[in-house]
From Swiss-Prot:
Keywords: Amino-acid transport, Cell membrane, Membrane, Symport, Transmembrane, Transmembrane helix, Transport. This is Serine/threonine transporter SstT. Belongs to the dicarboxylate/amino acid:cation symporter (DAACS) (TC 2.A.23) family. The keyword Transmembrane applies. GO terms for cellular component: plasma membrane. The gene is sstT. The chain crosses the membrane at residues 17-37, 40-60, 78-98, 138-158, 179-199, 212-232, 295-315, 316-336, 339-359. It comes from Streptococcus suis (strain 05ZYH33).
């Protein structure tokens, strides 16, 4: 028994999740009436929902409070490229969802009371009201747009605080990130419960659309990595970007894939920049900053899963709303930085634009 526990601890999270998926499918087919297994999924999702608002508030506030002022002039270009790259990825995700719309099987029956917003004006009005929500109420009701807004305000205010106060904010962010890490560590059991619930209630056919959803996610990310990012690099460098792109993917991409955390990948990226001869004064700031605001993968995940929910519920999305969704996803993706799988916690931010019920 101890040997099994030891092997389990040494196994990476992706393999554990894979085992959880397989067990969920098998148990859903063999013993669909043991509904207590589905409780693992409910507890896992509940824990994520509970910690997510605090996670967003502390990480964004801490990132903004630590952002140094008066950097070299080329940092403006770097920041603009970060923001443009994230927005482009978000917009491509929306376009991919239009081309390949996916509808998912939901276990909830609360979709009949949905009142979709009537165009961009109503969406924008609702967005503004969420922005000025009471910060305590925003945390309690999981109003992520309000949480992001107040996190940005507090973060800017904390720039002028004492070092002791900033250290306290950093420690708070680290503690909450640690708690999130513990919850994410339980993902194999939670996903096993979620898969079991899906299979037990809907059968194997329910996995078809989730497989298509995964293909759409991966395809969009590959397109951004091999087409959009090289195009941006070409416009800046005026030369073939692919040798640099493939080198970065080889060194940094593999680590990023298995850690699923931009913060965890910072040391790898800094070593790569040093080896490539990049100015230390630039990459010492641009790499940590990019781990916060250059969140193309998170933006893709947020938008594709949001559009899947929207298509499932039959809500129409016009071009203006899609554009606003891309902007909101780009901004909210910053809240996913530093946490493995953190983008999944930010999906309600985008879904709230279209009055998608939180239970979905």
């Amino acid at each position: 028994m101890n040997k099994i526990i030891s092997v389990w601890k040494k196994m990476n999270l992706i393999r554990k999740i894979g085992i959880g998926v397989v067990l969920g499918v098998l148990l859903g087919l063999i013993a669909p009436k043991i509904t207590v297994i589905a409780l693992f999924g409910s507890l896992f999702v509940g824990a994520l929902k509970a910690i997510a608002p605090l996670l967003v508030l502390t990480l964004v506030a801490h990132a903004l409070s630590q952002a140094p002022a008066g950097q070299k002039s080329n940092m403006r270009t770097v920041i603009c490229l970060y923001l443009f790259g994230t927005f482009a990825a978000a917009f491509i995700a929306v376009g991919a969802s239009y081309l390949f719309p996916i509808k998912l099987v939901l276990s909830t029956t609360t979709t009949t009371d949905i009142t979709p917003p009537q165009g961009i004006a109503e969406v924008f009005q609702d967005l503004l009201l969420k922005v000025v929500d009471n910060p305590i109420n925003a945390l309690a009701t999981a109003n992520y747009i309000g949480v992001l807004t107040w996190a940005a305000v507090f973060g800017l205010a904390f720039r002028h605080a004492s070092k002791t106060t900033k250290d306290l904010l950093q420690s708070t962010a680290e503690v909450i990130s640690k708690v999130v890490g513990w919850i994410i560590g339980l993902a194999p059991f939670g996903i096993m419960g979620l898969v079991f619930d899906t299979i037990a209630n809907n059968g194997l056919t329910a996995l078809k659309d989730y497989g298509l959803l995964l293909l759409l996610l991966v395809g969009s990310m590959i397109f951004v990595a091999l087409v959009v990012n090289p195009l941006i690099a070409f416009l800046v460098m005026k030369k073939n970007p692919y040798p640099l792109v493939f080198e970065c993917l080889r060194v940094s991409g593999v680590t990023a894939f298995f850690t699923r955390s931009s913060a965890a990948n910072i040391p790898v990226n800094m070593q790569l920049c040093k080896r490539l001869g990049v100015d230390p004064d630039t990459y010492s700031v641009s790499i940590p900053l990019g781990a916060t605001i250059n969140m193309a993968g998170a933006a893709i995940t947020i938008n594709i899963l949001t559009m899947a929910a929207v298509h499932t519920l039959g809500i129409s999305v016009d071009f203006s709303s899609a554009l606003l969704l891309s902007v909101v996803a780009s901004l909210s993706a910053a809240g996913a930085s530093g946490v493995a799988g953190g983008s999944l916690l930010l999906i309600p931010v985008a879904c709230s634009l279209f009055v998608v019920p939180y239970v979905v």
